């Protein structure tokens, strides 16, 4: 019986190639369905697939056929109704028109084609064409950094990196291969010598010949070296370059008393979407979480999203803390610095000009991109207008948007992080 071993990487998903071709072909339909699903779901409910439906008419293959239009000259058999040269009226139907009618007991049609996309495919369509703007390579004038990683086994190398187990295994295999036939002959000769000593003890000549042959075979086996340079195996270490583009995202969230529970929920959903986007699209990125009311604190992910602490409103406290963290841990010469700020716009009146001054002088010259999201259905307040002045001075690296309801989160997010063409 013969066996077929399938060593393909997608052996259990043999139609993966066809599926990818299908997803590319109907990308517009799927992307539209994903956007509708995002607006329908909770932002915290993004990490699973979606049922996609495509109208049947959109998956039909185009075909060429004869139409029903035009004039045709055809000879039909005569009968008592028609005579030679008369024209026959075109039969009714077949024109593909639509009109009012009643239900019938016959006929057929085609439902929409539905299929399920996976979590990975859903997130791919969800974050398609999004990126962190102005991500550049830092330390262009410095030396690249490398890390040493294992890369298998080599026949050459430094003696300090010798792999003892693989070396002894190779030596053992070589000795078996080179002395295998001699050992087989030795076993046969030894067995024959024992038989002759037992059954023919007087046959001294043959016994002596066998003893000489046995000594010769043992000497041949001993001449096979225990360890040869061919057997030496070394651990292969290679230098792998570290990514030169290092990025950090500062997440600043207002948790003051003016933020209602609904407003805080929208802010958290926005940052959850941002966090999901960063962790999925970028392997090497730091995220710094800052919550603020009258004072600001750097917190971990759990406290950022779930703490109930609240208080008054002084937005500049968060900006000052961000600037201190930048100076201490993230020098702009080495890091691509990003920031996303969410607030309802309420702020102590004298503090809004301070915020603009801190941003203009201490933060914006050193960041790649800064986004401000104001969550309010009301008219904008002083903070928004101060930030508008910043946007005029830093048009390429500063953006601000307004959120009114949870349904605005995804469209605004795409607007802020839409991939930009590089001129």
Curated annotation (Swiss-Prot):
InterPro entries: UPF0229, vWFA_dom_sf. Pfam families: DUF444. Residues 92-107 have a biased composition (Gly residues). It comes from the Bacteria. Residues 65-110 are annotated as: Disordered. Belongs to the UPF0229 family. PANTHER family: UPF0229 PROTEIN YEAH. NCBIfam families: PRK05325.1-2 (NF003707), PRK05325.1-3 (NF003708). This is UPF0229 protein Psyr_4632.
